[in-house]
Amino acid sequence: MNQLRLEPIKKVSGTINIPGSKSISNRALLLATLASGTTTLTNLLDSDDIRYMLASLKQLGVSYRLSNNNTVCELDGLAGPLNAGEPQTLFLGNAGTAMRPLCAALTLGQGQFTLTGEPRMEERPIGDLVDALRQLGAEVSYLKNEGFPPLNITSTGLNGGNVEIAGDLSSQFLTALLMVAPLAKGDVNIKIKGELVSKPYIDITLALMAQFGVEVQNNDYASFVIKAGQRYVSPGKVLVEGDASSASYFLAAGAIQGGEVKVTGVGKLSIQGDVKFADVLEQMGADIEWGDDYIIARQAKLKAVDLDMNHIPDAAMTIATAALFATGTTRIRNIYNWRIKETDRLAAMATELRKVGAIVDEGHDYISVTPPAKLNTAAIDTYNDHRMAMCFSMMAFADCGITINEPECTSKTFPDYFNQFNALAN
């Protein structure tokens, strides 16, 4: 087993240019594929999830050219759906941002497709999306367990019509449905059942669809209307914003042990909801400064918060470890969907926080964290979850340091994370 020892860090300062957003990268690749014209994507994220998407697109006949560092991609659109003359099996690792949108997109054209992934992918639900696609006439079947990948898709195009989709588990299901709806054979009316989680991720989807020339009528997130006969048209260039969830670790570092840490690539003009993480740090007492495309965090005495963080579920994980350096009990609420991510993040976070001495209350959809008088070092298990590894790097700001098991799991979104993190200490 690989282990990384982080010795105590007394002070951090510097500037970090954040790698491209995973959410935006994979959405933009799919829209560029369905669009007419050639799209140049810059600041594309170079990570596992994006590689799975690119490999699948290539297998399905999509032509693209990548720069040497894999962050610029020039992709020739198909001006319509993906088709396959022969049955295709696509392996998507543990990339939810590839599995869900591709599952929907492959129902638009003609062909036979099998979607598979790593063992954890077979535990991540997709039933709500499949149910919605079936309401529009798609033929999708489960190869193992009902409601979970692997999947078989026999596609003959998607009908228009009325469709209901659950909103309370993952916004990725709605994102997938929205992106394919314009290419259905008739108007699509989507009604959301229950409360829609992670609304800001839907805003990312709608903003990108608009960039590619498609209009969606959003009725206060309770329903959406997508008119038929629309076509995606390449805007020519798409700049992928820095990943706001990835920015959260560096901003927290500045708040806990700054100096001054500046992250570039995200800011006031960002379309990602996770930039609101900086507002939470500010509520905890941090000194935050906003620019159009940067955010600066400076150290301050941090105090606990009690907040609903449904709108920033990924970045909220960073608050759980930042709470170790705040006075009082921090409570993070309405985060049930942590349980269906790369691992059951609620259970994993509770287990690992207790290792360093925190008093933790783990509920069905919340976690509360009270720091001990003195933090102790531990070997942190990462559960093959990139965010667990990055969150617990904050323990380097304790007098005891920390050991991270299997640190290479950050390759899912941020292969270079620990090099960048250590650079701030020097």
UniProtKB/Swiss-Prot annotation:
Residues bound to phosphoenolpyruvate are K22, G96, R124, Q172, R345, R387, K412
Cystine bridges: which residues? none
User: Main location per UniProt?
Assistant: cytoplasm
GO CC annotation, single: cytoplasm
Q: Does the keyword Amino-acid biosynthesis apply?
A: yes
Q: Which reaction does it catalyse?
A: 3-phosphoshikimate + phosphoenolpyruvate = 5-O-(1-carboxyvinyl)-3-phosphoshikimate + phosphate
Q: Which residues of the sequence carry a binding annotation for 3-phosphoshikimate?
A: K22, S23, R27, S170, S171, Q172, S198, D314, N337, K341
* Coiled-coil segments on the chain, per record: none
Q: Name one Pfam family in it.
A: EPSP_synthase
What PANTHER family does this protein's entry cite? AROM/DEHYDROQUINATE SYNTHASE, PENTAFUNCTIONAL AROM POLYPEPTIDE
Task: Quote the protein name from its UniProt record.
Answer: 3-phosphoshikimate 1-carboxyvinyltransferase
The source organism is Shewanella halifaxensis (strain HAW-EB4)
Q: What is the lineage of its organism?
A: Bacteria, Pseudomonadati, Pseudomonadota, Gammaproteobacteria, Alteromonadales
Gene from which this protein is expressed: aroA
